Amino acid sequence: MLDITFYKKQNNDNFVPCIIELCDEDYEKIIVSNFAKRFHSEKQCLIVEEEEYSIDAVYCDALVLEEAKEICNRLLFEELEKVQNYCSKIEGETINKSKLNFMFVLRDVLSSLGECQYFSYV
């Protein structure tokens, strides 16, 4: 199960969460792309998370977004050592192959977002 939480910003700077739950059979690019287009048009906040592992994308610039895509691609091509070294600096733990389904979805989301201004592992 993958939860994608989209936070809509209100006038008083509060955020209201809208959660989309994706089962394994829903890991299709068109579903993720449709969600990403909605996020992109709102230009607010995207949080993608699975269990304790989460990634925030809030106002990313193109350079950092490209780096995020590269991390996903490295996982998908099983260049795990480079990814583990990078991610251990950020979250103090390595990423294993059980996260690959998550990364497939994440890659499609990132590919559909276009430019944003901020990206970070949490």
Tell me what each language-model feature is:
Residues 1-122:
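Acidic (Asp/Glu-rich) sequence patches and key acidic residues
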